[in-house]
């Protein structure tokens, strides 16, 4: 896979300056798996054609062995979550449609990226559907398209020097 071009510096916008409206991200635990899966099934884009394709065991492995996760709660319910692998891959970032537009995605993204950079990684990557709202979200945060994997768009975020 070719290296991505270096993104131009991004300026902070009003949403960045204000921070998330609502709860702040906290580390996820295996006790959060049901709530995370409920959010995953509620999304409008990137829906699972087979809800059984991602299992509780997948979430547990991601949280306990492969990486780390974060959740945002509102009124005692998980309304957004994200999971990143220690290898530098963003596995999931989803917000319940009823809670979109409140900065939860940006807050979760910031938590993931901060943790991954703390591991000494030089480049992060993810895949998403081309032309999706997720692609636009990641582009606005400095991610660059670097090719395709099984029809999905591969995007990378290099660490700034």
Label for each model-derived stretch:
Residues 23-38, 146:
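A short beta-loop-alpha structural element at the N-terminal edge
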Residues 33, 37-67:
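Conserved GNAT-fold acetyl-CoA-binding loop/helix
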Residues 71, 77-94:
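Conserved beta-strand in the GNAT
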Residues 93-101, 128:
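A short, internal acetyl-CoA/4′-phosphopantetheine-binding micro-motif in the GNAT/acyltransferase core
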Residues 99, 103-111:
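Conserved acetyl-CoA pyrophosphate-binding loop and the N-cap/start of the following alpha-helix
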Residues 125-135, 151-156:
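Conserved beta-strand-loop-alpha-helix junction that forms the acyl-donor binding cleft
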Residues 138, 143:
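Conserved active-site tyrosine of GNAT-family acetyltransferases
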């Amino acid at each position: 896979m070719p290296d991505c071009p270096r993104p131009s510096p991004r300026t902070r916008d009003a949403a960045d300056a204000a921070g998330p409206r609502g709860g702040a991200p906290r580390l996820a635990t295996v006790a959060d798996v049901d709530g995370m899966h409920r959010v995953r099934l509620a999304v409008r884009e990137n829906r699972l054609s087979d809800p059984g394709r991602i299992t509780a065991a997948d979430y547990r492995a991601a949280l306990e062995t492969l990486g780390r996760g974060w959740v945002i709660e509102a009124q005692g319910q998980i309304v957004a979550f994200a999971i990143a692998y220690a290898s530098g891959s963003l596995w999931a970032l989803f917000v319940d449609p009823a809670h979109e537009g409140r900065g939860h995605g940006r807050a979760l993204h910031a938590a993931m990226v901060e943790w991954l950079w703390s591991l000494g990684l030089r480049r992060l990557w993810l895949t998403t559907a081309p032309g999706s709202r997720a692609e636009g979200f990641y582009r606005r945060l400095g991610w660059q398209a670097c090719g395709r994997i099984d029809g999905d768009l591969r995007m990378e975020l290099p660490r700034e020097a």
